Amino acid sequence: MSGRHALVIGYGRSGRAAAAFIKRQGGTVRVVDRADTPELRAELERAGIAARLGGYGAQDLNGTDLVVVSPGVPWDEPLVETARQRGMEVTSEIDLFFRACPARIAGITGTNGKTTTTALTAEVLRAGGLQVMRGGNIGEPVLDRIEQLHAEDWVVLELSSFQLESIERPRLRIGVVLNVTPDHLDRHKSFERYVELKTRAVAFMESDDHAVLNVDDPTCAAMRSETRGRVIEFGLHHPVGNGVTTSDGWIMMADAGQPRRVMRTADVPLPGEHNLSNVMAAIGAGYAAGVDAERMAEAARRFKAVEHRLEPVGTFHGARWYNDSKATNPDSTYKALAAFREPIILIAGGRNKGIDLEPLARTIARRVTGLVTMGETGEELARRVRDAGLDRVERAADLGDAVRKAAALAPPGSVVLLSPAFTSYDMFSDYEDRGRRFKATVRAELGQ
């Protein structure tokens, strides 16, 4: 990077890490961002970085030979396209990490379950005595910590479709694909393109790498033909030749047709069949890294729910409340609904990413006893769910109103579930902001 002149587009968490890395490597950095706040200006001034805020255009490419694109900036953004047309190198924070990382990388992708499986995989590898750094689409950027890594270490990354799109050659020593259902169609334009990006997690492997694939998901299963890596399958509902399955209440690891017990399914500490599948994926990754079965089981048994993913909030007036704010698409909400046998009062709604609401409305009407909607999709979702046959539907003006209305609908013994099925950007800064405000509002309104 020494002597390079970089333009960083977007100064969020990823952009900050890229700018700092390039400066550490001896390059110069300028930043452009559509946002313009006193806090952002002060932060850039403290970092000693020149910037243009409030918008950007082709003139910002002058004097630049490297363009770094943040995950929130579309890969077909006009400024990025112009940079390519001018022959400039275009990269991303996560691509810079892949190029410079001395350690082995395990990547977890899929439409849902990435964060939980990434966190659990990191714990499974640590249980095997390995040095592990966790990051990617969660936590602090790994590029900020790259100097801490050595060749014998592992990095476990959560990789979104946005990140996979921005990495030139995402070679993973272990690549896990959990599931692929329609998501981010507003950005990727088609499901086919979305699948293509997810496939990149296994497409650049060598013969000694491992692709951990969900055979219950036909799109994932089809990726077997797209990788040179050794395939480790996992599945609850389809036969598994070499990989992780269940039998007679046990999670089993089948190696060359020889099944071995790993742990009892009843000992999985997270609710829902989808979380059982996530645990099986992490065990597959641990097997690929050479971790002993008993150590994998110990790590899985002591694992705690990740924040905003079916996270227990508390019991109030006899109803159990859960924060599943990370459910930003319908498939994630379907899995959350399937995790409970009790009557469910669902809080849902937000900003749509180009998803058809009709299948979601039918599932909600069939599965829940009451619905409270909010956000941009709230009115349409409420109407469609009523049309699908559910009468107990309320429309909330804001989060506090949603909590109060859900509490009024919830009898003792029921579950109140925030699982929005849509993104948070209409009302909140991100899903974490939505989840934390939800927990605080529940405790403030209901008395704890």
Where in this protein do the model-derived segments appear?
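Phosphate-binding loop of NTP-binding sites
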Residues: 23-24, 59-62, 71-215, 219-230, ...
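Nucleotide phosphate-binding/pyrophosphate-handling subdomain across enzymes
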Residues: 2-5, 15-25, 263-369, 383-386
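C-terminal helical cap/extension that packs against the catalytic core
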Residues: 40-49, 358-414, 448
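N-terminal leader/targeting and accessory segments in enzymes
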Residues: 1-92, 96, 271
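Helix N-cap at the beta1-alpha1 junction of Rossmann-like dinucleotide-binding domains, i.e.
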Residues: 13, 35-38, 238, 375-379
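Short internal beta-strands
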Residues: 27-34, 211-215, 345-348, 367-376
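Residue-level signal for inorganic ion chemistry
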Residues: 22, 67, 108, 137, ...
